[in-house]
């Protein structure tokens, strides 16, 4: 895919900077949750009013028809916040949306440091696009270090997890149709990268979740 085939939002994610800073982000304050993002999510799920169902197809529990949301076959008057693939929710009515996925490979080194920065991005001449070294995120001092390489590939239906939306004009036109369809259901809210078909970082994901909660409160 050529650069002109995708939206400027994607190209803008790879800025060219002349600087002595080794970080990717330019925010004045940058941090991670003390116990990590996984524990942050686990802490949310431990709330007594949250019931978690694993290995469950949401589309077998939720049905949409003529502006009415059904849960387990009965009309549901509460609010449904959907964060999955929006085209799956509507049975691919307007076609599938394109995504890129990743294959991850980790390697352990018997030395405290492997690369100069926590994350190093690579151009198209490499099979992998990014290498992360985890001890540099947490500033841990260890005798060994672990890196992870990311290999991008096309996300096909039933194979690979959808990580990156591909915002071509065709895909955005399809998504607009799904968005308009979702708007017909007053108690249905779309949230997150898959449901909104947009690339968002973790901080923005958390912020948008809080903003939606405030709107509903």
Spans of features found by a protein language model:
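Mid-domain catalytic core of redox enzymes
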Residues: 62-181
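Hydrophobic/aromatic-lined pockets within catalytic cores
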Residues: 2-3, 45, 49, 82-85, ...
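Conserved beta-strand scaffold positions in the cores of enzyme catalytic domains, especially
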Residues: 52, 80, 146-148, 187-190
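Aromatic-acidic/polar surface patches that form glycan- and anion
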Residues: 30-37, 121, 198-205
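Conserved beta-strand termini and adjacent loop/short-helix elements that scaffold enzyme active sites
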Residues: 53-57, 134, 191
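C-terminal catalytic lobe of FAD-dependent flavoproteins
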Residues: 161-217
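Active-site/ligand-binding neighborhood in enzyme catalytic cores
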Residues: 1-78
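Surface-exposed flexible segments
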Residues: 9-17, 94, 201-212
